[in-house]
Amino acid sequence: MVGRLSLQDVPELVDTKKKGDGVLDSPDSGLPPSPSPSHWGLAAATGGGGERAPVAGTLEPDATVTSVVPNPASLSHSLAGICSPRLCPLSFGEGVEFDPLPPKEIKYTSSVKYDSERHFIDDVQMPLGLVVASCSQTVTCIPNCTWRNYKAEVRFEPRHKPARFLSTTIIYPKYPKTVYTTTLDYNCHKKLRRFLSSVELEATEFLGSDGLLDEC
């Protein structure tokens, strides 16, 4: 007895050309599931040096990764080409000159602090009775900024004489000077009192987000 069975709403049969060996793994095939070969098994079967032949219409995983992940060496070269030399503090000098000399020894203290900002602070203390009571200086280098702030301050006593001296130097890149000097001359009763300070800068390479003056 021969007849024809017609079913409705039945999906089409799996195309063996597109699915490959996947048909053998289906429960309706009557065959046990075939183990999926590993990458090294395919490489050994082809006899290649760890490479497998690409399938038509697909992309190899290595090719996709290479197109997305940039080369670190190329990034460093590109950043080095963008960065320009930057002036950083090289040395800092300060001096106070008195004529006549003070009767006692003058104490001089200095300190350097490295933090999110760069500070160089020094202080001069002298015995009571002298005109200049204190002298302090500060050099501030702010990270990720194109200017340098330099401040010098001298205080005088008693109060009827000049009480304070303040100077600020802002260094712009378009004026590439390396040495800045500030001088204060003070004459009281024909006695010379002189205050000198200087800042010296050098050019160094700078990479935008890597810390400030970590390389300075």
Curated annotation (Swiss-Prot):
It is found in: Cytoplasm, Cytoskeleton. This is Refilin-B. InterPro entries: Refilin. Interacts with FLNA and FLNB. One of its GO terms (molecular function) is filamin binding. GO terms for biological process: actin cytoskeleton organization; actin filament bundle organization; epithelial to mesenchymal transition; negative regulation of bone mineralization involved in bone maturation; negative regulation of chondrocyte development; skeletal system morphogenesis. Keywords: Cytoplasm, Cytoskeleton, Phosphoprotein. GO terms for cellular component: actin cytoskeleton; actin filament bundle; cytoplasm.
